[in-house]
Regions:
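Domain-length accessory/inserted modules outside core catalytic folds
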Residues: 2-45, 52-140
């Protein structure tokens, strides 16, 4: 299972999750196993699902677009489960608080590069997903 989290209250992850799960059903049924393989969580929760404020998050000095495994290794966070968690920050900080444009704040290239690095040989669906994401209408 992959858990995608964003660090804003925006909903770009919802579109991402919709597209990725749709393609996972087609391209990697064994990995999908009948359940959603990717879940979007509020980025202001820690690994155990405990609420964390933006201020607390900044105090942990978590780098933008950091892989959760890297943060665990640096002891900046603790892992409550074995899910692969990818922490993604909005890459256009000046747009984060523009409500009507929040869905555009996730850089698809950053998402895909992290997924490729994290999934390794299992990333064959990512290339297929790129076109699917465009068709669903997410940011490119």
């Amino acid at each position: 299972m992959i858990t995608l989290t964003t660090l804003s209250t925006a909903h770009p992850a919802d579109v991402f999750v919709q597209a990725a799960n749709h393609l996972l059903r087609q391209q990697a049924p064994a990995m999908h196993n009948g359940q959603p393989a990717i879940h979007a969580l509020d980025g202001r929760t820690d690994a155990a699902g405990c609420f964390i404020t933006p201020e607390q998050f900044k105090q942990r000095h978590i780098p933008r677009n950091a892989l959760w495994s890297d943060l665990v290794r640096r002891k900046q966070v603790t892992s409550a489960h074995k899910d692969l968690i990818i922490k993604l920050n909005c890459v256009h900080d000046d747009m984060v608080y523009q409500e009507e444009r929040r869905w555009r704040t996730l850089d698809l290239r950053v998402v895909l590069s992290h997924l490729r690095a994290a999934l390794g040989p299992q990333c064959m669906w990512v290339q297929v997903y790129e076109e699917g994401f465009r068709r669903i209408g997410g940011p490119c």
